[in-house]
């Protein structure tokens, strides 16, 4: 298995971001390949964003999920995106970087570049759904063109897998996640990061699951996103 930790090396200063703390990373879980006697599988890839309210990365939503995905025939990456005090759109840029990086290494990793899925749980679901809804929007246009040097389609997920995701900044918000994500620019950005309002015809398909008894992230988060995607 290719099991590496890859630092996400972005010129945050060039993007007007003062990055603080640990670097964002991608941890790979890529099945071994035997090209001498085995044709490429071109496996689908799942990029997993653990939850944690933008304050930490939940260990149960990282490696454990990646190992399960391996068992199901996927390759996997765990994206440990930047945490507080780093604010939006830092995490959005890192998710876009991860998608593009994976596609650039598709042959090396034996993955299908047209089957790159982003998954997320709780606040990690907000990271995943942010990329799914904003991949061709104003927040990413300059980043994809000037920093990555690619077209927007290079960072578009082919699907989203969202478990009890943080979505809305309205009545049913998981308020702590948004306070960590946009603390210094709360009033300026709070509406922009309410993702039920960012869905367009270009948003990729999603599998969304939640429980009505969730005492942390209200189930209405998933319902609002599903309703917006149905329209």
List the predicted regions and their residue ranges.
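Catalytic nucleophile-loop/oxyanion-hole region of alpha/beta-hydrolase
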Residues: 57-59, 64, 79-113
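Primarily recognizes the serine-hydrolase "nucleophile elbow" in alpha/beta-hydrolase
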Residues: 100-177, 190-191
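N-terminal cap/lid segment of alpha/beta-hydrolase-fold proteins
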Residues: 1-42, 89, 171-175, 200
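Active-site nucleophile elbow and catalytic-triad environment of alpha/beta-hydrolase enzymes
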Residues: 32, 146-150, 183-204
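Short beta-strand/loop motif that positions the catalytic acidic residue
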Residues: 202, 207-210, 214
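Short beta-strand element of the alpha/beta-hydrolase
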Residues: 42-51
């Amino acid at each position: 298995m290719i099991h590496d930790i890859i630092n996400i090396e972005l010129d945050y200063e060039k993007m007007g971001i003062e990055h603080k703390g640990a670097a964002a990373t991608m941890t790979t879980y890529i099945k071994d390949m035997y090209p001498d006697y085995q044709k490429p599988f071109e496996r689908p890839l799942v990029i997993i964003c653990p939850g944690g309210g933008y304050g930490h990365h939940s260990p149960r939503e990282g490696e454990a999920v990646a190992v399960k995905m391996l068992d199901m025939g996927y390759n996997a990456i765990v994206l440990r995106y930047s945490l507080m005090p780093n604010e939006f759109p830092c995490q959005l840029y890192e998710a876009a970087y991860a998608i593009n990086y994976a596609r650039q290494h598709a042959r090396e990793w034996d993955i299908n570049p047209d089957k790159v899925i982003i998954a997320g749980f709780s606040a990690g679901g907000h990271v995943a759904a942010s990329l799914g809804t904003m991949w061709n929007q104003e927040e990413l246009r300059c980043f994809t063109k000037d920093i990555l040097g690619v077209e927007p389609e290079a960072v578009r997920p082919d699907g989203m897998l969202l478990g009890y995701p943080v979505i809305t900044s309205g009545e049913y918000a998981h308020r702590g996640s948004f306070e960590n994500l946009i603390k210094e620019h709360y009033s300026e950005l709070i509406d922009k990061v309410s993702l039920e309002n960012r869905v367009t015809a270009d948003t990729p398909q999603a599998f969304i699951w939640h429980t009505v008894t969730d005492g942390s992230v209200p189930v209405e988060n998933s319902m609002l996103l599903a309703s917006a995607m149905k329209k």
